[in-house]
């Protein structure tokens, strides 16, 4: 045996928490307290190494974690390296072509190899301390200090299951080499065996660790390569610490490895089995499978295969045992000054690497005469096959019906199609141009956008989230038919199609960007004047139904503040919106102008946009009759032009703060609290409307509705066609804060946006990025976006590629949350994720956004299916299925037209959503397949009943027979 302790294997003098040798035997990796992963060459520590090139020792340094690296584990194929850290993140690394880079300022040479992160797994809410790959490398298990074990699919990086059963920190996890179970060990002094078929708890073992003392960094248990033994850590049998061994099936401790003077931290089985003498494969078949320990009395003991295991302890020693002997084969003392925390065997089975908290690594190279002769892989596979059967291709679950398999196929195609569609949208965004010409130049010639279908009307003042308008999701669905044992048919959808990226781009090219959504720093030009902004819209004509509207407001501040009026301001307790931020100087404000553009798509393509401009002008005393001295007045000139042609103009004796307009009217809000409405030709449609305070936000829809928010926090919505006030409300309900509820002084609340949502209801966004939608039916504000779910897995994953309002609001929330303190590590992310999805589902329904509603619904159903939450899944399915019904016949057909249940939601058929989206998403977890089959049967019966009712409705009724008297008269006349 050769032992070595290379001094050059280090992590800047800090602890080394994990070590693992690549299955190919070319590299080994270490993770340490310096937040780095280092990949080393095995040639430099090989026992037959004669010429060591120091420049080739360290192959790469990975610096992508932001916390201590607790665990590194190679996949069995050696391509991927998984790492877990204190930053609660798991990363999957892969080698890429070329050489690596060096850390700036470190003075280190560039890496020899180039390793990059190919997948980041987020979901844990505390430190990730142990990892283990499945036998086929398709799944990764992770144990964390959040008391859970997460199961990750390597096909897509999604967490497929969260195992909750431990009441304390999970510090070790290991995978059954057969693939049927997972074992985890926790500080609650229990070991839990989990089934991989449905991720249920198979057995909880306790009692063997109840007398254990102290605490350890890890409890890294291990499964034997034969699949029969689990060696655990941190056991105690007076007067020694032990490593209890559990036997498969009964899951009870049959014997212990005794001898350490401190708690056992890590155990590691050799990858293969050994025998004392060389033998042929025929001897291996005849011999028992070698599950017995040293007390075995088998007659063929000399040829019986046995396991080799290494144990590391807090007593700074390492012991190596075989299951063919009751005494340790090897004891390593005085190699480390602190606890041993991780072990790794080489692929050939004759080298052992160990790392310690003292920041050092030791290597032990054994001879065949010491450990025995290693079984070939084919022999080991034959041993497992004789005991467990053929484990190749063994499925984790068993489908109970052909429908389950067909729905799983539909779900897989659905997920793949959605993923490809998202990637295409991300890689090929639609081209959108924003026209912001310099005010010193003339308005450029611009082509009017092409006429869009009537169902795709947009306002020219639409925000940036309108650019990527989601295309229609529905498409022809291929179906598969089969017959059940009772002879009835069942229709199974194959997949749900998604539109191509080309369609989305074509529909998005003609949509403009609302200049009011641009950053305030972009609004003022370099010379201090306000540039003109053009927003392309879809003004069809001057009728009542098809309009386009845009808005503008002056750049007084970056945001507006709502706060309670001071005591000196009056006792009415009214709200006031005050200007905050950088106020434009008077000289600058006096020369700045505000302008908007409106296009008319009814005109030819070369027509120029209509421009409305409000420009401050000053009149001196010499220009006014009857006034002397240096007195001057400030006015605002309103000019409407098309190119160089002036359509109309007017003057207002006040400073203009906001502008809005469409093909029907123009609206001008002033600082003195008046609102002037003009017709499209420039006539004053009505006397000036006095609001009592300056207008700070204004917006209009495609028809005749106008929204206005004043500085005092009052909101008005008028229908200018009928000259009625549709809504008059205050933003007072948005001001209430926790400090006010506690009786403290109320802080201010900044409003950054107030406009019409796409559904036509007013939408207000605060500086905290909380968004509120006014529900005219409930007559109250609905909070549709907030930061109440920081631990949700979907807190920042809703993208705006679908062009939805809710997606954009969610992204703003995510950016705002990034600046806030992190949440508690003990937060239950599962509960928050479910609550967040339910909130998003209700918010998309309130916004009347069918695309986002369907997206949230799919995510919610997949989450419930992953958690096997049958009660909520049943409730959702029942709401989409309709009212309960028994055997459908003509007498009960009236139930299908029950007015209390709407068969549609946001223009989508509920039964179609149930058949094409909900049921295929439920098929991802076979644990709920019985519930799935139940609703498939019910849906088939409902659709059959609906078909019968429709056929009855279209059956023509026979004409009534002629009256008897008329018939007799005709007969007499004929005679």
From Swiss-Prot:
Residues 418-433 have a biased composition (Low complexity). It is found in: Nucleus. Signal peptide: none annotated. One of its GO terms (biological process) is chromatin remodeling. Its main location: nucleus. WD repeats lie at residues 10-50, 64-103, 123-162, 165-204, 214-256, 259-331, 335-374. The keyword Transcription applies. Residues 418-510, 948-975 are annotated as: Disordered. InterPro entries: CAF1B_HIR1_beta-prop, HIR1-like, HIRA-like_C, WD40/YVTN_repeat-like_dom_sf, WD40_repeat_dom_sf, WD40_rpt. It holds the Pfam family Beta-prop_CAF1B_HIR1. Residues 435-445, 499-510 have a biased composition (Polar residues). Residues 478-492 have a biased composition (Basic and acidic residues). SUPFAM superfamilies: WD40 repeat-like. GO terms for cellular component: chromatin; HIR complex; nucleus. Residues 923-954 form a coiled coil. Keywords: Chromatin regulator, Coiled coil, Nucleus, Repeat, Repressor, Transcription, Transcription regulation, WD repeat. Belongs to the WD repeat HIR1 family. Histone chaperone involved in maintining knox genes silencing throughout leaf development. This is Protein HIRA.
């Amino acid at each position: 045996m050769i032992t070595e302790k290379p001094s050059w294997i280090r992590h800047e003098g800090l602890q080394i928490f994990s070590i693992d040798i690549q299955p190919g035997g070319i590299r080994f990796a270490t993770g340490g307290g310096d937040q780095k992963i280092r990949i080393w060459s095995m040639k430099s520590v090989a026992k037959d190494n004669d010429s060591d090139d120091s420049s080739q020792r360290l192959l790469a340094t990975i610096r992508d974690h932001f916390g201590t690296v607790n665990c590194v584990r190679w996949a069995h194929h050696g391509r991927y390296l998984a790492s877990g850290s204190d930053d609660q993140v798991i990363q999957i690394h892969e080698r890429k072509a070329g050489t690596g880079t060096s850390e700036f300022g470190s003075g280190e040479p560039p890496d020899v190899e180039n390793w990059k992160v190919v997948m980041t797994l987020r979901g844990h809410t505390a430190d990730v301390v142990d990892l283990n790959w499945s036998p086929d490398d398709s799944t990764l298990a992770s144990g964390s200090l959040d008391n859970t074990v997460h199961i990750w699919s390597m096909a897509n990086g999604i967490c497929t299951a969260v195992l909750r059963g431990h009441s304390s920190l999970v510090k070790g996890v290991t995978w059954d080499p057969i693939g049927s179970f997972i074992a985890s060990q926790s500080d609650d002094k229990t070991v839990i065996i989990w089934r991989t078929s449905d991720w249920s708890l198979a057995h909880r073992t306790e009692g063997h660790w109840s007398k254990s003392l102290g605490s350890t960094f890890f409890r890294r248990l291990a499964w034997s390569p034969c699949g029969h033994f689990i060696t655990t850590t941190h056991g105690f049998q007076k007067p020694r610490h032990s490593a209890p061994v559990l036997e498969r099936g009964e899951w009870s401790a049959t014997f212990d490895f005794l001898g350490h003077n401190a708690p056992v931290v890590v155990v590691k089985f050799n990858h293969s089995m050994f025998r004392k003498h060389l033998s042929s494969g025929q001897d291996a078949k005849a011999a028992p499978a070698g599950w017995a320990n040293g007390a075995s009395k088998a007659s063929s003991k000399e040829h019986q295969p046995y396991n080799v295991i290494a144990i590391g302890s807090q007593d700074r020693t390492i012991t190596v045992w075989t299951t063919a002997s009751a005494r340790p084969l090897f004891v390593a003392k005085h190699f480390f000054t602190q606890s041993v925390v991780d072990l790794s065997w080489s692929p050939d089975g004759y080298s052992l690497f160990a790392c310690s908290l003292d920041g050092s690594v030791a290597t032990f190279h054994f001879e065949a005469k010491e450990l025995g002769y290693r079984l070939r892989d084919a022999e080991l596979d034959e041993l497992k096959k004789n005991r467990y059967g053929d484990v190749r291709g063994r499925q984790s679950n068993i489908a109970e019906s052909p429908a389950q398999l067909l729905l799983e196929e539909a779900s897989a195609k659905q997920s793949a199609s959605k993923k490809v569609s998202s990637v295409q949208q991300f890689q090929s965004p639609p081209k959108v141009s924003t026209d912001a010409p310099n005010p010193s130049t003339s308005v450029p010639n611009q082509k009017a956008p092409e006429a869009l279908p009537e169902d795709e009307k947009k306002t020219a003042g639409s925000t940036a989230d309108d650019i990527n308008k989601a295309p229609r999701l529905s498409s022809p669905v291929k179906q598969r038919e089969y017959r059940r044992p009772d002879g009835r048919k069942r229709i199974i959808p194959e997949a749900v199609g998604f539109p191509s990226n080309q369609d989305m781009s074509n529909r998005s090219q003609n949509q403009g960007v609302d200049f009011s959504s641009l950053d305030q720093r972009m609004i003022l030009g370099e010379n201090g004047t306000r540039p003109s902004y053009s927003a392309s819209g879809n003004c069809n004509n001057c009728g009542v139904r098809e309009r386009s509207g845009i808005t503008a407001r002056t750049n007084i501040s970056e945001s507006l503040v709502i706060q309670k009026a001071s005591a000196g301001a009056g006792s009415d307790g009214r709200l006031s919106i005050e200007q905050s931020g950088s106020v434009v100087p008077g000289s600058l404000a006096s020369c700045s102008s505000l302008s908007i553009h409106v296009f008319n798509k009814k005109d030819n393509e070369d027509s120029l946009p209509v421009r409305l401009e409000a420009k401050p002008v000053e009149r001196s005393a010499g220009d006014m009759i009857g006034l002397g001295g240096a007195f001057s007045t400030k006015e605002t000139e309103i000019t409407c032009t098309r190119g160089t042609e002036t359509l109309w103009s007017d003057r207002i004796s006040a400073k203009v703060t906001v502008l809005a307009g469409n093909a029907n009217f123009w609206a001008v809000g002033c600082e003195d609290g008046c609102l002037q409405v003009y017709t499209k030709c420039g006539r004053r449609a009505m006397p000036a409307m006095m609001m009592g305070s300056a207008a700070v936000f204004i917006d209009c829809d495609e028809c005749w509705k106008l929204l206005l928010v004043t500085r005092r926090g009052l909101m008005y919505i008028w229908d200018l066609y009928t000259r009625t006030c549709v809504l008059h409300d205050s933003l007072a309900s948005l001001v209430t804060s926790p400090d006010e509820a506690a009786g403290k002084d109320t802080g201010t609340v900044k409003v950054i946006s107030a406009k019409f949502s796409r559904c036509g209801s007013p939408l207000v966004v605060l500086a905290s990025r909380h968004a509120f939608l006014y529900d005219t039916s409930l007559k109250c504000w609905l909070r549709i976006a907030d930061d109440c779910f920081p631990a949700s897995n979907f807190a920042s994953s809703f993208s705006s590629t679908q062009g939805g309002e809710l997606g954009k609001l969610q992204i703003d929330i995510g950016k705002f949350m990034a600046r806030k303190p992190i949440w508690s590590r003990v937060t239950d992310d599962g509960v928050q994720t479910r609550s967040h999805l339910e909130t998003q589902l209700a918010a998309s329904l309130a916004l009347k956004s069918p695309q986002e509603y369907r997206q949230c619904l799919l995510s919610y159903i997949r989450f419930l299916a992953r958690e096997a939450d049958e009660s909520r899944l049943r409730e959702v399915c029942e709401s989409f299925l309709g009212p309960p019904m028994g055997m459908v016949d003509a007498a009960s057909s009236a139930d299908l037209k029950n007015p209390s249940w709407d068969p549609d939601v946001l223009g989508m058929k509920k039964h179609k959503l149930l058949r094409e989206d909900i049921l295929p998403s439920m098929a991802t977890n076979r644990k709920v397949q019985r519930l799935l089959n139940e609703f498939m049967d019910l849906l088939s019966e409902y659709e059959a009943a609906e078909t019968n009712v429709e056929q009855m409705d279209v059956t023509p009724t026979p004409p009534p027979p002629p009256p008897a008297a008329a018939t007799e008269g005709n007969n007499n006349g004929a005679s």
